Amino acid sequence: MNTKTPVVVMVGCYLRQGRSVALEAAARFVQEGRQAVIVEGGPGTLVAPPGVELVQLAPGCVCCVGQLPLRVTVARMIRLIRPARLWIELSQADHLPELRKQLDGPGFAGAIDLQDAPQQFI
């Protein structure tokens, strides 16, 4: 892979609201290219706006019980979808250090560039 995929982790949002905030954020950046969003599972059905690929993982924390599904999903999205930016919704901010450790670890170090969420979404 020649370029790193920017990855933005949206934290501190609660389930239903957080998932829609992540989709809204991605939709605002569609002009830069295809966006991809990974959200924690929860009630209800989500519909991705045009230009946004959405994957909803099974309910549970993505860095604890959902660690393997998250890693597989990130790898597949980067390889197959090749998004201009990948957004990951994380509802509990106290899990951010563990998630960053996983994404900074072997397998992703040369493929992704972890970035802070744009100010308007914090």
Which functions belong to the PLM regions below?
Residues N2-Q31, V39:
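Glycine-rich P-loop/Walker A and Walker A-like loops and their local beta1-loop-alpha1 context
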Residues V11, A36-E40, P59, G110-I122:
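A generic structural motif
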Residues L15-Q17, L68-L70, Q92-D94:
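Short beta->alpha connector loops
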Residues V39-G41, L46, P50-I88:
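Conserved nucleotide-sensing/catalytic segment adjacent to the nucleotide-binding pocket
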Residues I81, A93-I122:
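Phosphate/Mg2+-binding loops and adjacent switch elements
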